[in-house]
Amino acid sequence: MTERYADKQIKLFSLTSNLPIAEKIAKAAGIPLGKMSSRQFSNGEIMINIEETVRGDDIYIIQSTSFPVNDNLWELLIMIDACKRASANTVNIVLPYFGYSRQDRVAKPREPITAKLVANMLTKAGIDRVVTLDLHAVQVQGFFDIPVDNLFTVPLFAERYSKLGLSGSDVVVVSPKNSGIKRARSLAEYLDSPIAIIDYAQDDSEREQGYIIGDVSGKKAILIDDILNTGKTFAEAAKILERSGATDTYAVASHGLFAGGAADVLETAPIKEIIVTDSVKTKNRVPENVTYLSASDLIAEAIIRIHERRPLSPLFSYQPKGKNNA
């Protein structure tokens, strides 16, 4: 059992979106979750009460802004305000999943940049720092005028696949879309494996027309993406890989939303195993071949390092056994 963290000036609070990961983070950090209550009135309004003193403390609020996105976002904003009014020393937010991060640019005329709007709201509410996990677009960090620590899950995935023996030239890491090349290359470098990309003649509306850039024939393929939403991207990519001669297909994503009947889509796809982190607690049905890999130890270590003013750089890498550290 993890020993109790000595400094009692740091406090962790969990809101309602993902209590399981918050409990794991608290256990890994050796810091019990603070006492608070959150309730929603019949008219939809949210009321929060912090049931212990936070005066002069460094506060870390854990909340994934997943579905219901707007309720979870407002609960977070209200909790931030409660901490500020209770004279907390610093108010830091831990977002295992950052909702609205995909709305990071104007893709069509007269569209908003909602990720920037959310960043403005959180900053205006009075936060001092953001800790998050695998932002959809890393430039979202620049939407804040405060420190943002964007932790990477690729080292966790690399360690998992290395233990399963999925590495080397017999494995190919595949990006199911051209925007995910950097993520695929990062995992491939850890596994000493080649990469491949699934591209499309026009757009994603005709996924069956996708073609592969790279060699997957006779290899075990690992599809990697940041968000698993409806499952269609993975399902169609797996079919393309199967037609192209891949022997087995695995899939991995940082955030498993499993929205819109994703389980039905994925269970009919030729995918042996799907790995996601526990960044999102979903009420939707999850496919039987899904394995959850907890990001709680990574987040807990980041929180302690931030509090102790130590560097986070050791958290951004994984050194496979047998490799020279020199």
UniProtKB/Swiss-Prot annotation:
Q: How does it assemble?
A: Homohexamer.
Q: Which UniProt keywords apply?
A: ATP-binding, Cytoplasm, Kinase, Magnesium, Metal-binding, Nucleotide biosynthesis, Nucleotide-binding, Transferase
Protein known as: Putative ribose-phosphate pyrophosphokinase 2
Q: In which pathway does it act?
A: Metabolic intermediate biosynthesis; 5-phospho-alpha-D-ribose 1-diphosphate biosynthesis; 5-phospho-alpha-D-ribose 1-diphosphate from D-ribose 5-phosphate (route I): step 1/1
Gene name per UniProt: prs2
The yes or no answer to whether the keyword Lyase is present is: no
- Top-rank taxon of the source lineage equals Bacteria
Where D-ribose 5-phosphate binds, per the record, is at D225, N229, T230, G231, K232, T233
Which GO terms of the cellular component aspect does the record hold?
Answer: cytoplasm; ribose phosphate diphosphokinase complex
Q: Which species is this UniProt entry from?
A: Streptococcus pyogenes serotype M1
Q: How and how many cofactors are bound, per the record note?
A: Binds 1 Mg(2+) ion per subunit.
Where is it located? Cytoplasm
Principal EC category: transferase
* Record EC number: 2.7.6.1
Disulphide-bonded residues? none
**Names of required cofactors:** Mg(2+)
Binding sites annotated in the UniProt record for ATP: N43, G44, E45, R102, Q103
Q: Which InterPro entries match?
A: PRib_PP_synth_CS, Pribosyltran_N, PRibTrfase_dom, PRTase-like, Rib-P_diPkinase, Rib-P_diPkinase_bac
State where Mg(2+) binds. H136
Under the heading Gene3D superfamilies, the entry gives:
3.40.50.2020
Q: Read off the PANTHER family from this record.
A: RIBOSE-PHOSPHATE DIPHOSPHOKINASE FAMILY MEMBER (PTHR10210), RIBOSE-PHOSPHATE PYROPHOSPHOKINASE 1, CHLOROPLASTIC (PTHR10210:SF41)
Return the similarity comment: Belongs to the ribose-phosphate pyrophosphokinase family. Class I subfamily.
- CDD domains xref list: PRTases_typeI
Free-text function comment from the UniProt entry: Involved in the biosynthesis of the central metabolite phospho-alpha-D-ribosyl-1-pyrophosphate (PRPP) via the transfer of pyrophosphoryl group from ATP to 1-hydroxyl of ribose-5-phosphate (Rib-5-P).
Which Gene Ontology molecular function entries are recorded, alphabetically? Answer: ATP binding; kinase activity; magnesium ion binding; ribose phosphate diphosphokinase activity
**Reaction catalysed by this enzyme:** D-ribose 5-phosphate + ATP = 5-phospho-alpha-D-ribose 1-diphosphate + AMP + H(+)
